[in-house]
Amino acid sequence: YHLAKLGYTDVVLLERKKLTSGTTWHAAGLVGQMRSSLNLTQMVKYSGNLYETLEAETGMATGYRRTGSVSLATNQERLTEYKRNASLAKVHGVDVQILTTDELRDKVGFFNLDDVVGGAWIPKDGKADPANVAMALAKGAKNKGVKIFEDVKVTGILKENGKVTGVQTEFGEIKSEVVVNCGGMWAREVGKMAGVSVPLHACEHFYFLTSAVPGLGDMPVVRVPDESAYYKEDAGKILVGLFEPNAKPWAQNGIPDDFCFDQIQDDLDHCMPYLELAMNRVPVMESLGIETLFNGPESFTPDDNFQIGESPELGNFYVAAGFNSIGIQAAGGAGKYLAEWIIAK
């Protein structure tokens, strides 16, 4: 999309199965703005601004809404981190307000805040429908001349004299001066084809969905990192997602060839400690039923940083992967800056 926007329209996108399959289709779609560095803050801020305008450009709804977000701190160390990040975010024009516990009650009154020492409120944070965002970007790219082919699996990377020269597919070769590995949780395998190390691995990622909550409205996204959880409204229900410290690796012997819009076997025993914390944090959950326990794969990197840029092993072979479950939040900015990176060279 961004290459075409910059005038480079001789671009082909190859998708092994269907667009949004793998992880995008089940992503939570949180679009925050407060990150731990200037570059990342700028990147995710751009994503939100892009998603806000995509529908007008493409005619496809992205489901993007600026609901605001609240991040709760249950200790002073966490609150200090929020204050530091808030100061950084303000440099890039991101409105971040540090609130007292009493002020937080006005934002998330149905949360138990007894042990909360403060928090961060970001009015322009939001959420989107990940699949719709992906399809809107695809339509925008096609409108500008990009060709997109589904059900085409890449089987090899062509190279010569230390530079990439194209890709091998099930249906033949495509010559190309530049190749970008956006393979998601398959990016490590695609990298191997090129002799490029892409250190990431899929983990099981869980979320719960409650029954409908009367009068819930469009609540802010709520993050409680000290309990490894986030909360958002989802069609009148509460979705509780987990980022547990001891995650479960998935597909250590390889991702199944036919994996597409698939779900992984759930593990209630693994999730129960976090579900109990969630019920304490949101007391109304005790009277609600849990309609869904979802388990799907997300890829993570060893240092929790993105894998983005030109590979050191092979010239003109770029990587954009390993977004550690915030791919929707990062995608707009990552696409923009990687496209500019490619063109600048």
Tell where the protein language model's regions lie, with residue ranges:
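Short beta-strand to alpha-helix junction loop
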Residues: L38, Q42-K45, S71-E81, A120-N143, ...
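Helical element adjacent to the flavin cofactor pocket in flavoenzyme catalytic cores
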Residues: G119-V178, C182-E189
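C-terminal catalytic lobe of FAD-dependent flavoproteins
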Residues: P130, D257, Q265-K345
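Conserved FAD/dinucleotide-binding core of flavoprotein oxidoreductases
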Residues: E233-M279
